[in-house]
Regions:
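Generic secondary-structure signature for well-ordered alpha-helical cores
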Residues: 21, 74, 107-108, 133-136, ...
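Conserved catalytic cysteine-centered active-site region
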Residues: 43-46, 52-59, 89-139, 145, ...
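Condensing-enzyme catalytic core mediating Claisen C-C bond formation in acyl metabolism
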Residues: 1-59, 154-222
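Structural motif
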Residues: 85, 141-143, 167-169
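Phosphate/pyrophosphate-binding loops at sites that engage ATP/ADP/AMP, CoA/4′-phosphopantetheine
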Residues: 68-82, 220-226
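Short glycine-rich or small-residue beta-strand-to-loop segments that form or flank ligand, phosphate
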Residues: 82-90
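Short, surface-exposed alpha-helical segments at coil->helix boundaries
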Residues: 62-66, 96-100, 214
Length: 226
């Protein structure tokens, strides 16, 4: 990242002050997945190029979020976030605030507001939209991390990788500012995972494309431009 100063300046603007990401060191070769499953899932051949990130046994959404947050604070010397939000659908604790663990590991003041958001991979984007639309005093630290378990021989096993990202939103020499946005909600189920289950259930990809991206997403883009 190439952030500017974290404090207000003459041309200070509210927006993204810095972004960082953290990926596990391990990589899974997609060709290795195909070699194991091509007898039953030959359609994976089209996805069997390259590799994806894979968390090790001692890594989870919290540890990856800590690393992403640590890199972000190093990029913004003197920045002390007043809030820390962790978005993930794979939080290691169901009844313990995961964001508080991250905040403690990052050395944030004990008065910082911490919260977990979950139930959808879109939760991180929703939190970012809220932070940009509703400026709050000080700097907001937004973290997102995932360590999803894909069903064997599924397209997700090829596509979904593990990792974390961190964003600082506040007033300063912003890398990017919020110009315009719109939202549209719909109970469109492209995939879902029931409570107590490890794997997602996904719908047919052409239906997701035609009924989801080409209808819902395009309508949202048009509404924003209007």
């Amino acid at each position: 990242p190439t952030p500017g100063p974290s404090g207000p300046t003459d041309d200070a603007a509210h927006g993204l002050l810095a972004t960082t990401r953290s990926l596990p060191r391990l990589r899974l070769e997609r060709s290795a997945v195909l070699a194991q499953h091509q007898w039953m899932a030959p359609g994976l051949r089209g996805l069997a190029k390259g590799r994806r990130s894979m968390a090790s046994w001692d890594e989870d959404s919290v540890t990856m979020a800590v690393e992403a947050g640590r890199q972000l604070l190093q990029a913004l010397p003197g920045c002390v976030p007043g809030t820390a939000t962790l978005a993930s659908t794979t939080l290691p604790f169901a009844d313990r605030q995961n964001a508080a663990i991250v905040a403690a590991a990052l050395g944030l003041p004990d008065g910082a507001l911490t919260r977990d958001v979950s139930s959808s991979p879109r939760a991180a984007l929703a939190e970012l939209a809220a932070a940009l639309r509703q400026p709050a005093p000080g700097t907001q630290l937004l973290l997102a991390a995932e360590r999803r378990i894909a069903r064997p021989a599924s397209a997700q096993e090829m596509i979904v990788g593990d990792g974390a990202a961190a964003i600082a939103v506040g007033c300063g020499a912003a890398l990017a500012t919020h110009v315009a946005s719109t939202t549209r909600h719909a109970d469109f189920v492209d995939h879902f995972r029931e409570s107590g289950h490890d794997h997602d259930y996904g719908w047919e990809e052409r239906w997701v494309r035609d009924e989801g991206y080409l209808k819902l997403a395009v309508a949202a883009f048009q509404r924003c431009l209007d």
